[in-house]
Amino acid sequence: MTDFGGEDLFGRGDYSFWSRLFRPASESLVEAAAISVGARVLDVAAGDGNTAIAAANVGANVTAVDPSPAQIERGRHRSEGSPVRWVLALGERLPFADGSFDHALDTFGDNLDEPTARPALEEMARVVRRGGVIGFTRWTREGFNRDWAELEERFLTGGSEGSSSPLLGTEPTVTAAVAPFSTDVEIIRQTLSIAWSSADSFTDALIAQDPYLHDLHRQLPPTRWGAFTDELRGLVHKWNSHATGGLRLEFPYLRVVVKTLPDGHGGGR
C-alpha cells in the first residue's frame, strides 16, 4: 500500500485478479452485517470496491476509503452509478468524526495486518456509532494460506522460517482484540474456493498479476526469484484438490461481525 509519499503498490500488477475471486466474501460479509437501506456504511481498505458495491446494492449510503490512488480510480470506475463516495485515506488514520457511520467493514485489508492491526481496528470502532456494527474478514494460517505466507516470509528474511500467526487470524485473538468495545462477537469460519483450468495456468496468472508478487520480484535477485516461483508452483500443486486436471484451491478465513457496546468505544449520534 502507498504511504501517500511512496510508490503505490497497486499501481503494479492487476488486483482485479484477486478482486473477482474475493467477491463472494464481500457479499457474505455485507449480508452477515445486516446492512439495510439507508445505512451509513464505511468500507475500509476498500480496494477496487467489492464490499462497497455489495453494500450499495442493498441500498446503503457508502463511503469507501483506500490508501492506493490506483485502487481509488478503479473503484470509482467500477461503482459508477452507485451511491459510493471514494476517499483516499489510511485505515489506521480515518478522516471522519466519531460515530459517523452505522457500519464499518473491512474485507482482507492490509491495515488489519501487523503492525497497524490494533490502531486500524480502534479507528473502525471510533467512527462507528454506539451500538453500531464492525465487520471484517481475515485469513487464517491454515493449508495453502499458511504455506504461502511462510514461503514469502522465508524468502524475504533470507532463509528463516516464518511461523507467527496474524493478530486477527484466530478466534481467541479476535475476541481479545475487540474486547475493549464489544462482548457481542460472531466469528464464523468460512472458505473461499477458487476454480481454475489448471494448477500451472493459475500459478502463471498469479505470478503475472498479483501486486504483492510484483513487489517481491523487485526485491529478490533473479536466482532467488526463480527459486521462489518454483516453490510457489509446487505449493499450488500440493494444495490442489481437483481430481481431474483442473484446479480447486481453498482459502480458509474468519468472518467477524462485532456489535459495539451502546456505551462503549467511539462517539454517538
Task: Describe each region flagged by the PLM.
Residues 1-39, 50-54, 71-74, 78, ...:
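Conserved class I S-adenosyl-L-methionine
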Residues 4, 22, 48, 168, ...:
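Conserved Class I S-adenosyl-L-methionine
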Residues 34-36, 57, 80, 129, ...:
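Short conserved AdoMet
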Residues 40-44, 48-94, 119:
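Class I SAM-dependent methyltransferase SAM/SAH-binding core
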Residues 92-104:
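A short acidic, Gly/Pro-enriched loop at the edge of an enzyme's catalytic core
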Residues 102-117:
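A short SAM/SAH-binding and catalytic strip from SAM-dependent methyltransferases
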Residues 118, 125, 129-198:
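Conserved catalytic/acceptor-binding region of the Class I
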